[in-house]
Amino acid sequence: MKPSGIVRWIALFLCLFICLASLASCGREPTDEASTAAVSGEEAAISESQKNAGGTGKLSLPYVKGDSLNPFTAKSLPNQMLSTVLYDSLYSVDATLSPQPLLAASGSVSGTQVRVALKSGLVFSDGSSLSASDVVYSFEKAAASPHYRAQLSNFSSAKVQSGNIIFTMKEVDPYALSCLDFAIIKRGSDSSETAIPVGSGRYSAVRGDSSVTLKANKSWLNGNTTKFASISLVDVPDSDSVIHSLEIGNVNFIFQDLSGGVYQRINANTTEFLMNNLVFLGIQSKNELLQNPKVLQAMSLALAREEIASSAYQGHAAASAVPFRPDWNALKGLSTAGVKQNKEAAIKLLQEAGFDKTGASGARTGGGKTLQFTLAVNKENPFRLSAANMIAAQLSAVGIKVTVTQLAWADYTKAVQGGSFDLYLGEVKLSNNMSLAPFFDEAGAAKAGINQEGAAAASYKQMLTGAVSLQDFLSTFQENPAFLPVCFRKGVAARSRDVQGDLISHSGDVYANLQDWHF
């Protein structure tokens, strides 16, 4: 081949090699430099988005637009939960229901009087002074409101005396400070039904043409270190859509109290905490068989409370054989009844009570009487219905024959209030001082079937006055139970995964550390 031909072949080969190399480079992964540039551009876009939203991103919380944000008239759960964000109180309660001073500088309980001194220099979010007269005004509003009425039912009045607030109670209560977590509003700022009262909380609410925005309160007493200058409130009108609103990103946080007896799995960061909702087995004290302390003790020992909490309530409850929340600070160091089932001990007690024979139905008999009862339950609550069936099976296993009567809510309420039951499965929300007034007060919501002259009722009243200790009452209650505690229910707080910082929620404040959240 001539030299010129060789040169042409070499040139053709070089052209082909260059083309192939170029094609190969088109399908190659981008270089590290290219990836870094892309990420930097994305971060810049996020940074700009955050800047537009006040420097920290846009946080959205649920509320019900058709409901009020007034802490004394709000009916919906989301709006009630926002109360601790918009309004401070004299005291807040921590995760163990221990009262922590917020607006209060000090507080003391003496007999039927509670004396509270305010911190100095307190101001509302509008810059006006917060005084003792605002506290008295708020107390009177709270005591008449559905949300706070029960927890303040033992308080008869409040007045200003030498700059302090003096509360007068109807009965002695050593744990009264835990009840003083009602919202404090500026006197007269709730003059209209649509008004959002002025508060002193971490945020204030600003109403726009068609929306409500929360603005950080720069005058907050603890120094506002919140990462969000503003928070959007998003209308979530019904409880069925609240989980969906979180999962699609419309809101960043929700709270569910599971009062309907159903749990739906949530795709988010979640935390659960004990609420004050006590599930209990009500007892008709007029039934002669249920007046026998050994029968009642046996029933308590026969209950597998942990199994009920984990199975019937799907883990959203904590077993308790005492009528107080297991994590209540006042119980620390005390001896409390165990929650473990003990069928052998239960059977022994029944035999000691004279029920040493077993009939054809499996029920124990003695002295011509049979341990056979009905158990009323609201069939519309799946958690409670499942618990009732488990309780019936557990009691029947030791010879206490129980037949579950499933009733619609209206019929169930009528039966309980009318005393037409042997046993009933109920639930009551205790106030933060763990008052058992719902059971032992003549106007109590859970007084049905209880002997108000019985040993447990008498011991409880003595405990409040200091005549006997809390430990003494627990011992008396275990020996002579007026009702059988089963468990305390839990609530579920859920937050979108893009929000960072610890998620601290408890029964006193589901937004306990809102100021620490960030994107």
Predicted features and spans:
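Gly/Pro-rich hinge or "lid" segments in bacterial periplasmic/extracellular proteins
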Residues: 178-232, 238-241, 343-344, 348
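Append "and occasionally in soluble cytosolic enzymes with long acidic Gly/Pro-rich linkers
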Residues: 291-390
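Extracytoplasmic/peripheral linker and loop segments enriched in polar/acidic and small residues
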Residues: 403-412, 437-499, 519
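N-terminal lobe/hinge region of extracytoplasmic solute-binding protein
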Residues: 61-109, 117, 140
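Ligand/substrate-recognition segments at binding pockets and active sites
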Residues: 357-430
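Ligand-site clamp/hinge motif
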Residues: 219-262, 401
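Long beta-strand-rich cores associated with HINT superfamily self-processing modules
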Residues: 495-519
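Surface-exposed binding/hinge segments that line
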Residues: 108, 113, 150-190
